[in-house]
Amino acid sequence: EYIALDIQRYAPHPFRDIYLHIECASANLGLIWLQQIAPARVDDYVCRIFQQLWRDHVDISDLSVITEQLQQILGEAEFAPTHWHDFVQSSGSDALDKAYDKASELGVTYAPTFFLGEEPFQGRAQLPLISARLNAGI
C-alpha cells in the first residue's frame, strides 16, 4: 500500500502498524506538565515518546511508562514525583481538556498540524510548502 511505503521512507526502522490506534492522554499529560516545569526539555520528551511508540512498540497509554520517561528526561534531581502525581490526579485533567478544546477551536482534526501564524497546515505533505513560505518570509 502506498501510504505505508511513503511513511516508511521517513523512518529509520520498520513499522509494524501505521494505523495503530492508541490512547494518548497519559503522554499528553506528560507533555503539558513538562511544558509547565521544564519547557526546554519538551523536544526531548516528544522524541522519546515517538521512539517508544513507533520504534520500541511500548504502550504509551500506560502512565508508568510516561512517568519513567519524565524521570529519565529530568533526572532524579529535577523530577518531583509528588508534583507529577498531584498534577495527574488534580489539575492535569482540566489542563488536558483545555488543550483538547483549544485544538478543536483551532480546527485541528489531523496530526500533525502545523501553524504559520494562524493558518493551519495538516499533514507532513505540507512541510515543503511550509518551508518555502518560511524561506520566502511569508
Where are these regions (language model features)?
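C-terminal cap of thioredoxin/glutaredoxin-like
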Residues: 48-138
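Structural alpha/beta surface segment adjacent to cysteine/selenocysteine redox centers
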Residues: 1-56
